[in-house]
Amino acid sequence: MLGKKESEISMLHKVKIPLIIVVVSSISLWVGSSFFSYFTHADPPEVVLRGIEKDGCYAGMINCAIKSDNGYKISEISVFLDNKELELRSSKKVGARKFEIPFRLDTLNLANGEHSIDIESADASYHRNKSKEKWNFYVDNIPLKAAVLYPEYKVDQGRTVHVRVQSNKRLDKAQIKFLENLYDCYPESDFSNVYECFIPIDCELAANEYMMTADIQDCVQNSVKLASKITVNSVTFPKQRGFTVAKEKLEEEKEVSMNNRILEEALEKWIKDYPKKKLWAGNFENPIEIKRVATPYGEIRTTTEKGRYLHRAVDIINHPKSVVWTSQNGKVIIKDRFLMTGNTVAVDHGLGVVTLYCHLEDFADIEVGDYIKKGNPIGRLGMTGYANGYHLHWELRVNNVAVDPFEWTKKTF
């Protein structure tokens, strides 16, 4: 019996000793690791602010939280609103690696406009690594007011409606709806509260009265809906007997030109990504000195190759190979040769406005992507493509609808 008891004690000692060794080793490893981490940790604390986005806009009460899931425990945090320290629960002595400190911010106690929150933090390591983060944000507790500057617009077929919306503050969204099409409005200039867009009236749109609506929304989601009337006046467009282009010329063009479908696809792509501001200033200029207008905008044509159609551009004539220049500041988005339009240059002027210069003899020293100024040469007057004489086919599109370009030379949009 005694021998059995001694055997059990011996067995217990055999188990206990390794267990003690494991425990002591684990503690030593943990202490060593903590000791090592304490002296070597060098990463600055990572602290985030929930509830407020940088450069966001807010009204009323904001539920916020300071959160961290850091590599080393945070010893303290200081929070400043517009350089004045906020007294927050547990913000001074945190003592944890992972934590969340909720707080509420009542913007009604703040002035409308720009504010900032700064968060300074330090960890508990030997180096007391520190970080400082800044969140700029805006307060807007002003009731939204907006109006369309003209309650009614009267416009001819083939012309452009310049819509302007006046607001009492900066807007997040100003969108016009006309004939199921949506047009985004943008500030007339930096810091302006007048938002504008351009609505093209197709030359074949029936003369009638139409309603236009505006969806206006500020940066804190207040919204108003506005309405205005657009009266489209009928225009009697002239008729042309038509013309022919020699088959031999068309066959030659096919050898060196791309299909015009490629041009249309490229324009659709570019117009979706147009610059959200005007690149132009003042009136547009005629791209050549005009000796004669061979074909006015909207003329009804009948040709063998294209059948009956409306000419949605102007054909203007000067001496063969005369210099052609851009009618306004903009960015070259297309420079290529196409079957119908020949050597073609397209210039993006921003806000969905594009001009095209077609049938050029050749190109000036320009490349796609170049920003060019009004009056810069883009090529020479030619008769490439579907043309039977020297002329410039000048086209102006608004949101990819061709309108009368001469209107843009007479009015400041």
Regions found by a protein language model. Give the residues of each.
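N-terminal Lys/Arg-rich, disordered targeting/topogenic segments
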Residues: M1-K14
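Long, low-complexity serine/threonine/glycine- and acidic-rich segments characteristic of extracellular
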Residues: S37-T40, P44-V139, K177, N181-Y210, ...
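Low-complexity, Pro/Ser/Thr- and charge-rich linker/hinge segments at domain boundaries
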Residues: F39, L49-G51, Y138-Q157, K229-M258
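Cationic-aromatic interfacial patches
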Residues: Y138-K229, S234
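Surface-exposed, glycine-biased beta-strand/turn segments
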Residues: L226-T341
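Zn2+-dependent peptidoglycan hydrolase active-site motif and core
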Residues: R312, T326-D362, Y390, E395
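Short, well-structured beta-strand-loop connectors
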Residues: V323-I334, D365-L381
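Conserved, short, structured surface segments that act as functional micro-motifs
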Residues: T344-H349, V353, D370-F413
